[in-house]
Amino acid sequence: YTLDAHTRRMLAGLRHPVRIELFYSGSNPELDGQTRKYAGRVKQLLGEFQRLAGAPVTIVQSDPHSASAQGAAEERGLKAQITSMGELWFFGAVITSPDLPERQPQTIPFFDYREEPRLEYSLVRAINALWRSHPPRIGVISTLPVMEHIADRQLKPTWWALQQLMTDFELVGIDPTAGKLPDNPPGLLLIIHPNAI
């Protein structure tokens, strides 16, 4: 793997140790070759993270094949998959920092090989989330109905693109007719304005 420059900077700047618990049902004989190959790539990428980190990165691998281990994996947010024979198997991770036990563990419920282009991003996002006590705030200004609202007596959801942002940021709707920003302004403004209007 050749890591992105941003990833390298983030890893070099780590100030606290990171523990990555990798749950992989590698002993299950029914796992297909594509999953096994992808597992090798995930482990290789985690090894690169470990090698380049400015603080210790511990990788602990477990193979949850007993019912109790599988139940514990599900309780920690991992998403079970089912083989053609009806057996559960897992391939995900829980990321924590021993120095920051009060912080919410970050879970990657399932490593899907179809999402490989986003693998590095998913790991970086999970590690970065450990250090934030509060998500950064983004103000959203738009005359379009981009945020959750009620129309025709129905609740209309937030636009999909903004829902994706909400996984890492707190979005604050700002009235486009307001003459000034709120007293506690967000650190970033997102102005959504269609070009043709």
Q: What feature does the model see in each segment?
A:
Residues 1-197:
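Short, surface-exposed patches at the edges or C-terminal ends of soluble domains, predominantly
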